[in-house]
Design a protein with these regions (language model features):
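ATP-binding Walker
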Residues: 12
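Short beta-strand-centered segment that lines the nucleotide-binding/catalytic pocket of NTP-utilizing
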Residues: 26-40
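ATP-dependent small-molecule kinase phosphotransfer cores
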Residues: 36-109
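Walker A/P-loop
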Residues: 15
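Hydrophobic anchor at the beta1->P-loop junction of P-loop NTPases
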Residues: 4-6
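P-loop (Walker A) phosphate-binding loop of NTP-binding proteins
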Residues: 9, 21
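NTP-dependent small-molecule kinase module
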Residues: 97-110, 124-133, 137-153, 164-182
Length: 182
């Protein structure tokens, strides 16, 4: 079964492409959703993250405030590297589990691994093809601000924390330009 790696910068429109492919019969592995799930209370990454960052990222029920955590890590490379180091192993483990399960069941036309950090996490070796969704930086910043209800500077920090366009191009088998509003 073909595994398509779907990647691109934040705000490029990966989720829209992913939703379209799902309608067409693809099985979607959403790395962002996995990342959200593995930092919940009771999960191994939760303990590592809360020990490192402390109570400043927790709400009154001791749940991780993802927006607060994001504002910290997207402004500080060392803290972002720590977060990636402690979460990627759990994310990759779950991605591998889902790929193997879907290969065994063969219920879909293909597998789409929707992963913004596909290259950074070295997940391209799990894919038969790499599809990169591209959008101009200003378009991406506007989308991220609207989607996440954050400031322009926070959006630019998130965009700046990812690989540049030339890096994505080097890995791309297909490039989808999503610079226009849908």
């Amino acid at each position: 079964m073909k595994v398509i790696g779907l990647t691109g910068g934040t705000g490029s429109g990966k989720s829209i492409v992913s939703a379209y492919l799902k309608k067409k019969g693809a099985y979607i592995i959403d790395a962002d959703q996995i990342a959200h799930d593995i930092i919940k209370r009771g999960m191994p990454a939760y303990e590592e993250i809360t020990q490192y960052f402390g109570g400043v990222i927790l709400d009154e029920n001791r749940n991780i405030l993802r927006k607060k955590l994001g504002s910290i890590v997207f402004a500080n490379k060392q803290k972002r590297d720590f977060l990636n180091h402690c979460t990627h192993k759990y994310i990759i483990e779950e991605i591998d589990r889902q790929i193997q399960q879907e290969i065994q069941t063969q219920k879909h036309l293909c597998i789409v691994l929707d992963a913004p950090l596909l290259i950074e996490a070295n997940l391209q070796n799990r894919c038969d093809e790499i599809w990169v969704v591209f959008a101009k930086e200003e378009v991406r910043a506007r989308r991220v601000m609207q989607r996440d209800n954050i400031t322009y500077q926070d959006a630019k920090n998130r965009i700046g924390s990812q690989k540049n366009w030339q890096t994505y191009q080097q890995y791309a088998d297909f490039i989808l330009d999503n610079s226009k509003d849908l």
